Amino acid sequence: MRHDQIPIDVPTAQALIRQQFPHLRSEPIRFLPSTGTVNAIFRVGDLLAARFPLHESDPAELAESLSTEADAMGELAGRSPVPTPTCVGLGRPDKSYPLPFTLQTWIPGHVATPTMVSDSPKFAADLVRFIQALRATDLDGRSFNGRGRGGALPDHDEWMEHCFTRSAGLLDVPRLRWMWAGFRGLPAGGNDTMSHGDLTPANLLVDGGRLAGVLDGGGFAPADPSLDLVAAWHLLGRPARTTFKEGLGSSDVEWQRGAAWAFQQAMGLVWYYQRSNPAMAGLGRSTVERLLDDPEVGAR
């Protein structure tokens, strides 16, 4: 648990939801364990989920951010070929819980793991259709906002140096430094396209081996078109990655940049969550291993 983590339990969540959303008074509420690190999630009846932010933040700024995310979720839901949650309510903080929270529609399915669909060309093809639909969304004059992943790779040098330092004894840091040196020197990405921005296993739902839904759509926004390619190394083995790359028609540069974003994300997971969240640390390790073993990117 982080030092700034805010406790939230079922009785507190139940009281807040029933007080602020009286029409849900009769709905059962239960906590949903997950590997997520940003929100505590509670199931509200059969059709909704409540997401309570876990870390200290300015309530007014967070409310504005959640409102922006709600708009992005609505836009994504209108473009996605698979179900994605929409926000149906914004809860207010009170003395029992100091931050705003959200009510969202519930999407059924099994949360993916790094290996669940690794050998599935059908799942890879589903991801292709999802990303193509996002890329076809009109930017309406928007561009990358400069925050987080999705812009210039060298902007992340300081963070990567921190990760390399903290990963000593956990990973083959000299080899990984060399790998980043190649990634950061890649040509700039193509024109921005609309991107989910965080296609990790925890945000992808599976049913019958197919993509059944995509979660956490609040970051739907313009970015480097290679950003959503991170799913290739977070989830897919080599044959399925080939299906994915060919389906998207990715150029070699776009593919390498996708690998770079997956690498940047994975390097922050292993050391940071080594003790607090083994599943997230494991995702980081498996992604790094896939990148190192990938003949198209690991031998840069």
Predicted regions and their residues:
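Short glycine/proline-enriched coil/turn segments at helix->beta-strand junctions
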Residues: 45-48, 81, 209, 234-238, ...
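Helical cap/lid subdomains and adjacent loops of hydrolase enzymes that gate the active-site channel
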Residues: 146-185, 247, 253-257, 282
